[in-house]
Amino acid sequence: MMSTDHCPAPLLRIQPQFSHYAQRARLAQRESLFYEALELSMAPMLDGNAAAACREWYKSSGRVNAIHGAFIDVNPASGDPAFRELSRRRCRESCTLAVELGAEQVVFHSSAFPFLRGGYLENWADLCAAFYMELAEEYRGLTLCIENSQDLDPEPLEALMKRTGDGVRVCLDIGHAHYSGTPLEAWFDVLGPSIACLHLSDNMGRFDDHLPIGDGGIDWAMADRLYQGLGKELPMTLEVGGLQGVDKSLAFLRRNGYFALEG
């Protein structure tokens, strides 16, 4: 049963771009925002010296609360040993980076193929759970948050959560849930106790548009009720494009008092 207690205002995060770091830093200071660093987990930042200045900026900011781990083509449960090994190396590198930058959470995408269940799903959940729990033990103090990405329903993440402990939780992406075809209530009902953070963006129900909050088809009043029903404060990341998207999203949330944000 969901709680009816009112949650306090959450810790809000954005995903800055180092190429516009000064603007992002001013926005973060003005709005008391933290960072979920994304770009360090994407090429060309994954290798070589290209990331040095970027890493130093994030480290010196004192605002990194989370890292979005490597996710492009990453599948730590791949049936191909070479792909599996590289995926796991990238995940471990993301955790090392998180420790370096002072993050508390690392977000990884769920890698389950959405149209296969049965033995495939059981094997995927077994392999991922063993690996993620190994990482959680190795990087104590970090919470690994597995995000619904191409998932059509909560079943893969539910299977994974049954095999893991407190160090491995769920990042519920509201936008991804919206275009999945499964009602948002089901995502909260099934995964609620395991949710450790939220990703917020809007879309029209077909693609991952990353629209400003309020510009798409998501029922944000319902999303707010479901969040409040969890009875716990969760960090939230605004994945809404550039500065204007963040400003517009914050104004919408505050105007409506959603997620305990006040104008």
What name fits each language-model region?
Residues M1-E93, L261-G263:
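N-terminal pre-domain/capping segments
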Residues M2-C7, Q23-R26, E104, P154-C171, ...:
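Histidine-acidic metal/acid-base catalytic patches
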Residues Q15-A25, E39-A52, N75-A77, P114-G118, ...:
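Acidic-and-aromatic substrate-binding clefts and catalytic sites of carbohydrate-active enzymes
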Residues S32, A98, A103, G141, ...:
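A structural motif
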Residues N49-C54, F83-C91, L121-A129, T182-D189, ...:
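Charged helix-capping and loop-helix junction motifs
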Residues R55-I72, D126-Y139, W220-L226:
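Alpha-helix-loop-beta-strand connector modules within alpha/beta enzyme cores
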Residues A77-R169:
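Active-site acidic/histidine proton-transfer and metal-coordination neighborhood
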